[in-house]
Amino acid sequence: MGFSQNVLGTLLLVTSILTGVAASADTPPAPLAINSDDSVIDINTTPASLELSSAQDSIATNLAIQNYLSAIDQQENEAGPYDPILSEMTYGLGNTLQHNHRYEEAIAAYKRSMHLHRVNDGVYSLSQVPMLRGIIKSHIELGSINEASQSYHQLLWLHMKTYGENDVRLIPLMDEVGQWHLETYAQMGRRDDLYHLQASLRLYSSAIDLTASQLGSTNLQLVDMLNNFALATYYRALHERLYPDAWGNPGGAPFGYRPFGFSEETLRRGTHYLNGLASYRNALDILENNPDAPIQDKAETYAQLGDWNLLFGYPDAATEAYHQAHSVLGGVEQKDLILDALFGAPKMLPRIKKQPVVSSKVSKKPGNNNDRLSVLNERYVNVSIEVTSEGRVTTIDILKTHPENAPELETRVKRSLHSSKFRPRFADGHAVLTSDFTMKMLTPH
């Protein structure tokens, strides 16, 4: 049964209310400005007007959600609990709840929508994918990393059941989930987060093996995956050094995965540097022998190889790789622009190569007062530092801390900067000292 006139009318009312909320969010009382170098945040909205506007939005949103729920109940009463229309309605409700930072309620709505799709479309239907992505995003916003990880694995498992384990359509998802695990470890780095490194290494190894076997060993898609695999082995070497007793209880492999490429035994032999070096050399071979490879990708990969050597304590090898990045650009029209992007300012290491994430149709409209409040609640320290030609920080000046009077944040940032390495700035082909370099350091709760 389709929509009744009453249900349709209710949904039109909900849409008009939500449109009004979005319009008010898109035209805030005053703009929020974040300057381009991220060194200073200027909130141009007074707290009073921000609170008033936020309260008005909250009332309108609550009314819209209540009407949405009423429409869902009415449709269920008229068409039954498994009517396909309900899956779309509950998914839309989940998006609305998520947009308004009501993440636990959003997860419940997404799960109901996903269940309805399983009933109507089949257990392995990819129609569940948008709901799973909504669940993942909500768990991440809540800081529920284990739950987000489980949902990511369910997403991968669903694609494997649909396509099989050797289908090239798995490659972008393996890359995406591998990158998420790598970034999650980079942000957390606790003893028990070893699991994220294991998952990332398995996924990248699987994606590399599948790409090479199905698309060819010189396919350009391999380059970024090889570089991120190398970075994951660096983090593993670092984890082994920080937590030498962590290897006795590594945790189980996520379901739906099977190992490819490097074995666990090989990865535990202390050959992390050699494994990563082999990945970078493989990436460079692909770029050197592929006439379609962009020249800037070659320069960037040499720069990343330099970063890799710097992180492992081989400054001479790092300098050689940085010089090779300069050399491959000889005679290139955009040479100065590319070099400025790579070496025009110090870059904190390590750097993860970002990949585009598949859209889940879950959008976040700009200008929402909740977004402005989240910026107000953000914890950060603005600093001015001096970076030597060897990539070490020697001087740190605190410019601003938010929230104020938080010496523990300043201590964390200083400790992090002193222990970090930077790709140094280059001028006229040589690494040079950089003074008064400003940075914004985010400090997670």
Residue map of PLM features:
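Charge-biased low-complexity segments
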Residues: 26-28, 32-38, 62, 80-83, ...
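Helix-turn-helix repeat elements of alpha-solenoid scaffolds
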Residues: 57-73, 102-113, 145-157, 193-209, ...
